[in-house]
Amino acid sequence: MIPKFLLRKTQCYHSGNLCKKKSYTELHRVLTKNHRVKFIFTFIFLLALGTASLAQQKVNWNGYMQYRFSDNYLNQTEFSVRRAKFWVNGLIPEEDGSWSYKLQANFLQQVKYQFLLQDVLVNYKINNFEVTAGQFVPDFSLQRKQPDYAIPLDERADVVNALVPGAETMARDIGVELKLDDSKTGSFSFGFFNGNGANTVSNQRNFLYVNRGSLFLLNNPESKLELGYNLSYRDAHNIQFSKIYGNNYAFTGNDFRFGFEEKLNLGAFELQSEYIEAHLGNQKAYGYYALADYLFVSKNLVTLSVEQLYDLNPSTINDPWYVVGYSYLIKGNNIKISLDNKFQFASNKTNALTTLQIQYFFN
């Protein structure tokens, strides 16, 4: 689907430079309002690399780039670097469990390709139980927890990008999360976070609480069926929800969100869907997506999807989007070429977006 920021960008071309400037600078304003925090995280990142090198521990580094061409058939035709991510991680095994860490950064086009830290975390795991602390993506929404390089389409659904709790700051927050994960029966997690996003110092005493659970109804090598739910709550104070309300709106009040999810695997066929609802005070934003894909001859992936988001911004169009996607897996997800065609049939016009993307892993 066409992300909401692209729709706002398209509308702004018809309303002058002021709106266009606001659309581009909103994420930049959110992510850079505390430069000291960015400096501290960068220092930790470099210190971790140096410490690992001095200790002669093996540090695993990884990275990938998504380079794309897109055309909305109206006023936007461009080449862009959608993502350029780099991360290091390591594992320290112990007799009664194992410690691991991860530090990940991304060059974001939306903020003029600034180098921003996304994940700074440490994890302890023993058997099926694990604890994660730091800055990372809270366990809310099936598709949001799936890596963007592994999803069958070029972008996650609008409802996921807009309604997960940390949507305004790369879906990340700072906190602690406990998780019990059994590969045969399902998983259960509970976490509490600052609640005002990534790379940001908390200025309140009210946490964001997140809970997710899933259960396998069918689980064997040939077929799997998993159902799940998501819950989150925070007492929000002056938090920007631009992906729900639009720019320059700060929300204060009860923020309660929930969702349901489903994933079915039958050999080369996969069906996945989610419904998410956000209650902000006495207002409600909600939406869904349903996605089906089939892998032909191990390298050809065909995807069909439909999604719809009802936000609280009166200037956006709420009609559903339909997607037809094709990916050629040259070397699995390590080298992949994909073509997505997205359509929205509004009351007075048809919106469309075509995206051609190449994904390449550096390591």
Predicted feature locations:
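Solvent-exposed loop/turn segments connecting transmembrane beta-strands
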Residues: Y73-E78, A105-F115, E168-M170, A198-R205, ...
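Outer-membrane beta-barrel "beta-signal"
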Residues: G213, Y326-I330, I335, T350-N363
